[in-house]
C-alpha cells in the first residue's frame, strides 16, 4: 500500500513538471523566468550563472480589490501580450513583458475590472544583498545589482526585507503604468539605468552636455550664504578663497516671502534686474549660482495668506462650527470632539502640527484644546497672520491649515502648485541660475503618500526650466532620483560637529546616497560665530572636514552668512586651509592608499605629510593639576588653553534652582519595554505655554492644556549654562559592567535640547558639576531612540534665554534594582574670571604665557610657531614668542599643573601627533 502511494505521488510530481510551462525573458546580463502560475522561479546572472531569487518564491503579480490581496493564479500568452489571471478575484490583467538588451519592461495594458485598488507589477524576493538603495529602488553588492525603475512618478518601488516591489494604484492611475527590471553585474549598473532613462523617456538631465551625475560640477563645492547685491563682491571673495565653484543664496535673502516669492528689494533693490545682475557678476568671476527654496511652503507673511488666504492652501483636518461666532470671541466650539487636531507647534519633523485654523477668510490661532467634551479651541487669536477678524455662522467649516516649520503648505492637487513652479522656473530661466536646492521637500508628504507627493513640486519646476541645472534637495523618491544631481548630507550641527560628521553625515546620509548610486557632498556644514549655545568654528574642525572630503573624494557645502564670516576672526585662515585641501582633492594628488587611511581618525596636514592628531580636552583650575596621556612618542608640548567662566558656589543667591531640595525625585530603572536610549524618567516643566505665535509646549502631557492652567514663563539661563546636580545612588551595577548614564536635558522653545550626561559609577551621595553640555558623547554612545527625541534637535541651535523644561532621561539603564535619587539641580551663575599670566608646568619645565586671558579667550600653540591669543570669536589679540625651551611631553601618562595669578579655571586641549604618512606632491 505504501509503495502504491509513493508511486502515485511521484507520478503526480512528474506530471506537474511535464505540464508546467516556464516563460523566460533575457537581457544581455540576466535571465528572468516566470512559470505559468505567475511565480518567479529564477533570476539568473547569465555571465556567472548565479541565482538571485529565493527558492519557492511567492507570486510575481498581486492585486488588491475591496481591501483584500489576491495573488496571481495563472500566466499565459495572449498574442503580443501576457495575461495574468487572479482567479479568486475574478480579474485579469493584460501586460506587455518586453526584454531589451539592458532591461525588461513590464507594462500594464488593461485591467478587466475598474474596482482594483492596486497592482504589484513586479515582486522579487532576493538572496541577501548587503546594499539597500531605497532612493533608487535597488538591492546590490559588489558583484550584482537588481533594480525596479518606475517608468513614471506613479509607480511605488520599495526595497524592504530583501524584496523589490513595484506597485501602481488606482488613485494615481493603473493602465499604462510600467516598470523596468534591471539585473546586471554592478559594474554595468549605471550604464543600464541610463539606457532605461533614454529608451523609456525618463528624466535624464545634463550639465554642459554631460549626464548630470557624471558632470565635473558634481565634484565641486558650493558656498551657501546670504548673497545680496550689496555684499556680492565680499561674498565672491570668500567663496574663491575657499575654492568654491558655486554660490547659493537663501530663500529669505533673494525672496521676501515663501509661496509667491516676490523679490526681496531690501537685498536686490531693482528687483529681478538686481538679482540677474548679481548672477551675472558671479558668472564673470567664474562662479555658478544656486537658488534655495522651501518646497511648496507658504509663509504666513506672503500675499497668498494675507489679507485673504488663498483657497488652495493645504488643509489636513476639519470640524464644524457649533454656534454663531462674532469677531471677538476667543473660545470657538465645534460640533464634535477635536481629538484629531494638533496640540504641538509645527517645529521639527513631518507630523501633523500647528495651531492655525481657517474659517471663511479669517485665520485664527488657538492656544489649547479643551471645554466640555474636548470640542473647543481655547485662547484664540482672531484675525491671525494679517487676516481680518469677522463673524461666522453656525455650520461653517473649520479647516486646520497644514503647517511645517512655521509655514503653511501648497495643496499640490490644485493649480497653486503650477503657479509656484512657473514663478521659480521663470526666475531661474530669466536670471540665469545654475542650481536649485529643494529644501523641505519631505514635508509634502502632508498631501498624501510620500513616495508620490514629495516629488510633485520638484518635478513640475524641473520640467519648466530651460537651462542646465544642478539639482539637490531633501526628501528624495525613486522618481526624483532621476532629476537630482547629487545629495546633501543634512543640516549642520552647532555643537559636536566632528562626531556629527562621522556618526551621522557619513555613516547615515553619505552612505545612504552611495547605496542609491547618488553622488553626495558632505554639507551642509556650519561656519559659525560664537554664541551662548555654540562656539565659533575653529581650524581643527575645518581640517577634520577637509580630511574627510579628501578621503571620500566628496565635496562640501558651507552654510553660513556674511555676519558670521566677519565675526569669526579666523575666517580667512580657515577658508585658505579649506581651499588648499580642495585643490589637493580635485588634482588627485594624494594616492588612494593614503586617502583610505584618512577616512578614520583625526589627521593634521603639515607640508606633504598627514599625521594622526589627538585633541584631548580636560578642565583644570589654577593651582590644580590633571593627568594627561600621550599615546604617541615623546614630543614638544602643544596645546590650546581657554579661560572658562567662573561658577558661583552651590546655593548662591544668583543661581537658578531647577529642582529644589525639598522635592527630590526617585528614579527607577526604565521598563524593559521602554525605548532606549533616552527613555524619559522625569520631567520638570517651567512653563506650560510660551507666548510665541508659533509655540505651545505640552511635551509629555497626557492631554491638551485647558484654559484654567497657569501659563508660566521660560527661564533665562544664558548666563547659567552650567548645572550642579546632587545625587544619591544605590545598588551599583556589577563590577566591570558599564555604569548607568543619566541625561539632565535642558529643553528650549521649539523642541530643541542640550544634553548633560552623568555616569552613575558610584554609590552614595555626590554633587556633580556639569560645566557644559556633553553632546559629543551622544552619537558614538547614546543615539536616542526616535520615539524619545530627535538627536539632531540636541545638536542644532539652542536658546538658553527660553528654557521651558528639564528632562531627566536614561541613556544607559542600570540593573533592575538600581535607584537614583535626584536631590537638587541648580543652574550655576557664570562669573567673569580672567586667567592672568597662566603657566603650565610639566615635570620640571614651565611654559609661561605673559598675557591675561579674558573669559573665553584662548591661547594656542602648535606646529612650533608662535603662541597666538584669540578672543572667543577667533579675533587675534596677541602673538607671543614661545619659551626657548618648550617642555617635552613624555609618552604615556604624565601630570600638568596650571598656575595663574589670582586663580581662575581653564579648558586645556592637549594636542599630540603620531607618525606621519608622506605623499609626493
Placement of each model-derived feature along the sequence:
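Glycan-recognition surfaces
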Residues: 304-318, 405-419, 462-568
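Intrinsically disordered, low-complexity segments enriched in serine, threonine, and glycine
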Residues: 339-344, 382-390, 394, 811-921
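Bacterial N-terminal signal peptides
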Residues: 5-16
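Autoprocessing Asn-cyclization modules and mimics
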Residues: 295, 299-389, 655
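Carbohydrate-binding surfaces of carbohydrate-active enzymes
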Residues: 275-299, 312-318, 548, 552-649
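Carbohydrate-recognition beta-sandwich/jelly-roll modules
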Residues: 25-247, 251, 269, 277, ...
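Beta-rich carbohydrate-recognition modules and glycan-binding surfaces
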Residues: 626-833
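Aromatic-lined carbohydrate-binding/catalytic grooves of carbohydrate-active enzymes
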Residues: 221-318, 402-448, 452-455
Amino acid at each position: 500500500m505504501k509503495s502504491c502511494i509513493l508511486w502515485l505521488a511521484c507520478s503526480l510530481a512528474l506530471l506537474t513538471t511535464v505540464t508546467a510551462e516556464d516563460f523566460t525573458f533575457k537581457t544581455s546580463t540576466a535571465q528572468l523566468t516566470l512559470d505559468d502560475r505567475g511565480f518567479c522561479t529564477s533570476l539568473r546572472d547569465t555571465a556567472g550563472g548565479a541565482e538571485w531569487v529565493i527558492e519557492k518564491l511567492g507570486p510575481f503579480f498581486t492585486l488588491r480589490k475591496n481591501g483584500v490581496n489576491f495573488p496571481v493564479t495563472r500566466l499565459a500568452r495572449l498574442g503580443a501580450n501576457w495575461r495574468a489571471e487572479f482567479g479568486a478575484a475574478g480579474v485579469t490583467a493584460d501586460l506587455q513583458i518586453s526584454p531589451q538588451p539592458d532591461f525588461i519592461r513590464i507594462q500594464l495594458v488593461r485591467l478587466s475590472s475598474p474596482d482594483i485598488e492596486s497592482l504589484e507589477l513586479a515582486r522579487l524576493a532576493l538572496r541577501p544583498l548587503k546594499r539597500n538603495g531605497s532612493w533608487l529602488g535597488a538591492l546590490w553588492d559588489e558583484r550584482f545589482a537588481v533594480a525596479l525603475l518606475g517608468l513614471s512618478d506613479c509607480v511605488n518601488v520599495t526595497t524592504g526585507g530583501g524584496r523589490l516591489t513595484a506597485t501602481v494604484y488606482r488613485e494615481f492611475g493603473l493602465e499604462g503604468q510600467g516598470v523596468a527590471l534591471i539585473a546586471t553585474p554592478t559594474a554595468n549598473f549605471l550604464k543600464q539605468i541610463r539606457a532605461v532613462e533614454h529608451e523609456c523617456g525618463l528624466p535624464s538631465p545634463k550639465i554642459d552636455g554631460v549626464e548630470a551625475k557624471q558632470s565635473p560640477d558634481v565634484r565641486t563645492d558650493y558656498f551657501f550664504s546670504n548673497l545680496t547685491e550689496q555684499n556680492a563682491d565680499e561674498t565672491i571673495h570668500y567663496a574663491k578663497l575657499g575654492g568654491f565653484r558655486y554660490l547659493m543664496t537663501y530663500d529669505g535673502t533673494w525672496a521676501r516671502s515663501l509661496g509667491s516669492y516676490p523679490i526681496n528689494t531690501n537685498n536686490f533693490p531693482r528687483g529681478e534686474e538686481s538679482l540677474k545682475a548679481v548672477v551675472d557678476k558671479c558668472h564673470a568671476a567664474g562662479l555658478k549660482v544656486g537658488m534655495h527654496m522651501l518646497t511648496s511652503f507658504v509663509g504666513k507673511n506672503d500675499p497668498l495668506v494675507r489679507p485673504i488666504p488663498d483657497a488652495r492652501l493645504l488643509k489636513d483636518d476639519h470640524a464644524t462650527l457649533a454656534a454663531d461666532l462674532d469677531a471677538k470671541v476667543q473660545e470657538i466650539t465645534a460640533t464634535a470632539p477635536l481629538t484629531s487636531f494638533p496640540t504641538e507647534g509645527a517645529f521639527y519633523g513631518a507630523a501633523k502640527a500647528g495651531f492655525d485654523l481657517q474659517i471663511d477668510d479669517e485665520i485664527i490661532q488657538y492656544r489649547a484644546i479643551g471645554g466640555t467634551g474636548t470640542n473647543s479651541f481655547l485662547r484664540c487669536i482672531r484675525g491671525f497672520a494679517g487676516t481680518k477678524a469677522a463673524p461666522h455662522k453656525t455650520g461653517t467649516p473649520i479647516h486646520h491649515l497644514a503647517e511645517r516649520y512655521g509655514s503653511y503648505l501648497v495643496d499640490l492637487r490644485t493649480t497653486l502648485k503650477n503657479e509656484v513652479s512657473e514663478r521659480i522656473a521663470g526666475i531661474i530661466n530669466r536670471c540665469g541660475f545654475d542650481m536649485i536646492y529643494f529644501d523641505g521637500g519631505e514635508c509634502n508628504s502632508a498631501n498624501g503618500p510620500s513616495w508620490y507627493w514629495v516629488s510633485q513640486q520638484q518635478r513640475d519646476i524641473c520640467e519648466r526650466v530651460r537651462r542646465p541645472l544642478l539639482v539637490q534637495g531633501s526628501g528624495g523618491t525613486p522618481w526624483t532620483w532621476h532629476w537630482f544631481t547629487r545629495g546633501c548630507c543634512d543640516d549642520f550641527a552647532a555643537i559636536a560637529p566632528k562626531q556629527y560628521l562621522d556618526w551621522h553625515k557619513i555613516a547615515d546620509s553619505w552612505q545612504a546616497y552611495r547605496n542609491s548610486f547618488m553622488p553626495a557632498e558632505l554639507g551642509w556644514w556650519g561656519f559659525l560665530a560664537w554664541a551662548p549655545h555654540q562656539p565659533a568654528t575653529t581650524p581643527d574642525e575645518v581640517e577634520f572636514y577637509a580630511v574627510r572630503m579628501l578621503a571620500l573624494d566628496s565635496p562640501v557645502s558651507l552654510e553660513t552668512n556674511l555676519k558670521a564670516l566677519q565675526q569669526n576672526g579666523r575666517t580667512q585662515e580657515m577658508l585658505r586651509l579649506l581651499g588648499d585641501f580642495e585643490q589637493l582633492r580635485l588634482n588627485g594628488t594624494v594616492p588612494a592608499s593614503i586617502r583610505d587611511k584618512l577616512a578614520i581618525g583625526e589627521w593634521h596636514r603639515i607640508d606633504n605629510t598627514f599625521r594622526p592628531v589627538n585633541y584631548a580636552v580636560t578642565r583644570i583650575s589654577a593651582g590644580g593639576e590633571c593627568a594627561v596621556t600621550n599615546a604617541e612618542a615623546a614630543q614638544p608640548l602643544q596645546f590650546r588653553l581657554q579661560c572658562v567662566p567662573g561658577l558661583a558656589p552651590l546655593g548662591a543667591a544668583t543661581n537658578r534652582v531647577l529642582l529644589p531640595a525639598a522635592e527630590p525625585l526617585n528614579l527607577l530603572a526604565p521598563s524593559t519595554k521602554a525605548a532606549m536610549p533616552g527613555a524619559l524618567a522625569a520631567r520638570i516643566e517651567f512653563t506650560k505655554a510660551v507666548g510665541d505665535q508659533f509655540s505651545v509646549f505640552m511635551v509629555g502631557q497626557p492631554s491638551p492644556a485647558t484654559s484654567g492652567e497657569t501659563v508660566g514663563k521660560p527661564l533665562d539661563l544664558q548666563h547659567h549654562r552650567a548645572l550642579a546636580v546632587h545625587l544619591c545612588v544605590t545598588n551599583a551595577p556589577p563590577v566591570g559592567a558599564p555604569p548607568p548614564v543619566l541625561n539632565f536635558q535642558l529643553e528650549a522653545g521649539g523642541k530643541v535640547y542640550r544634553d548633560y550626561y552623568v555616569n552613575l559609577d558610584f554609590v552614595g551621595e555626590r554633587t556633580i558639576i556639569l560645566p557644559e553640555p556633553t553632546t559629543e558623547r551622544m552619537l558614538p554612545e547614546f543615539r536616542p531612540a526616535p520615539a524619545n527625541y530627535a538627536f539632531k534637535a540636541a545638536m542644532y541651535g539652542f536658546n538658553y534665554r527660553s528654557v521651558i523644561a528639564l528632562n531627566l532621561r536614561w541613556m544607559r539603564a542600570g540593573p533592575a534594582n538600581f535607584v537614583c535619587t535626584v536631590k537638587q539641580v541648580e543652574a550655576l551663575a557664570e562669573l567673569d574670571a580672567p586667567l592672568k599670566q597662566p603657566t603650565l608646568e610639566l615635570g620640571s619645565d614651565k611654559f609661561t604665557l605673559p598675557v591675561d586671558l579674558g573669559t573665553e579667550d584662548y591661547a594656542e600653540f602648535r606646529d612650533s610657531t608662535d603662541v597666538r591669543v584669540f578672543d572667543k570669536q577667533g579675533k587675534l589679540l596677541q602673538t607671543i614668542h614661545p619659551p626657548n625651551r618648550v617642555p617635552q611631553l613624555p609618552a604615556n601618562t604624565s601630570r600638568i599643573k596650571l598656575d595663574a595669578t589670582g586663580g581662575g579655571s581653564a579648558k586645556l586641549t592637549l594636542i599630540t601627533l603620531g607618525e606621519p604618512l608622506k605623499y609626493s606632491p
